[in-house]
């Protein structure tokens, strides 16, 4: 008889769909191949997915909620993905949906912002980083000219490595150094704090931030202040 084992799989916040599927395969829950197929081609009955076209596994980016799940192994890819989507559907409350509605944005846009926050923070300052993102989006006449310039978007398109200067030339709508506004969709699956920050950002006049030698985020209104700070921090010196 085939033995079924129970396994707990913890999906870390900020993992991409590809990383989650790799983790599930490594945990013997389901194969990458099946998961990719079911992510790309199955039409899930959730209102938040209805406007996202089928055809690519990345259509679920942002919607596979990071949490600890219990699975019996092996399990069908359809069941596994559906379980994560159900969790997102629970966590993303009616109150949050009303907030999205009121903001004039879509759930997809809010999750895209949340995914940027998730990848840019170490678990602190989410709401202030959210303010920088929205300030840049909402004021295309600022020094930042509507460009988000977020390194994590380069990591999403360069195969997952630490970005280098040349990556800023990659021609992809996810390249926020090249293309203004939000990328086409989330770049990872954000946790609850990042989603909340995307819904309720702080109100600031900040357009820049950088991690200091003290491992704390410092925020700036102008490019000059930002550059001055970078010059004062040993972590940004060459050599």
Residues covered by each model-derived region:
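Short, flexible domain-boundary/linker segments around small modular repeats
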Residues: 1-3, 47-48
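Glycine-rich loop/hinge motif
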Residues: 2-29, 99-105
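Acidic helix-start/capping segments at beta-turn-to-alpha-helix junctions
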Residues: 14-17, 37-46
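DNA-binding alpha-helical recognition surfaces that contact promoter or target DNA
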Residues: 22, 37, 228
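A short alpha->loop->secondary-structure connector
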Residues: 25-41
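Bacterial extracytoplasmic/cell-wall-associated proteins, especially those involved in peptidoglycan
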Residues: 29-30, 43-239
């Amino acid at each position: 008889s085939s033995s079924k084992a129970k396994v707990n799989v913890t999906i870390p916040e900020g993992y991409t769909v590809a990383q989650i599927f790799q983790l599930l395969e490594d945990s013997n829950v389901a194969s990458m191949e099946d998961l990719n197929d079911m992510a790309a081609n199955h039409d899930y009955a959730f209102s938040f997915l209805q406007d996202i076209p089928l055809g690519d596994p990345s259509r679920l980016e942002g919607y596979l909620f990071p949490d600890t799940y219990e699975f019996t192994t092996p399990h069908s890819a359809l069941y596994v993905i559906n379980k994560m989507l159900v969790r997102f559907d629970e966590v993303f409350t009616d109150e949050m949906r009303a907030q999205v509605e009121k903001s004039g944005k879509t759930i997809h846009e809010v999750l895209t912002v949340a995914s940027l926050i998730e990848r840019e923070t170490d678990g602190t300052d989410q709401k202030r980083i959210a303010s920088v993102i929205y300030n840049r989006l909402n004021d295309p006449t600022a020094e930042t000219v509507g460009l988000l310039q977020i390194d994590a978007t380069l990591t999403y398109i360069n195969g997952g490595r630490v970005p280098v200067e040349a990556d800023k030339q990659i021609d992809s709508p996810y390249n926020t150094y090249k293309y203004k506004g939000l990328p086409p969709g989330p770049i990872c699956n954000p946790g609850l704090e990042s989603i909340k920050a995307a819904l309720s950002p702080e109100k600031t006049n900040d357009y820049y931030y950088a991690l200091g030698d003290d491992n704390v985020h410092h925020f700036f209104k102008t490019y000059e202040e930002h550059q001055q700070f970078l010059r004062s921090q040993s972590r940004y010196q060459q050599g």
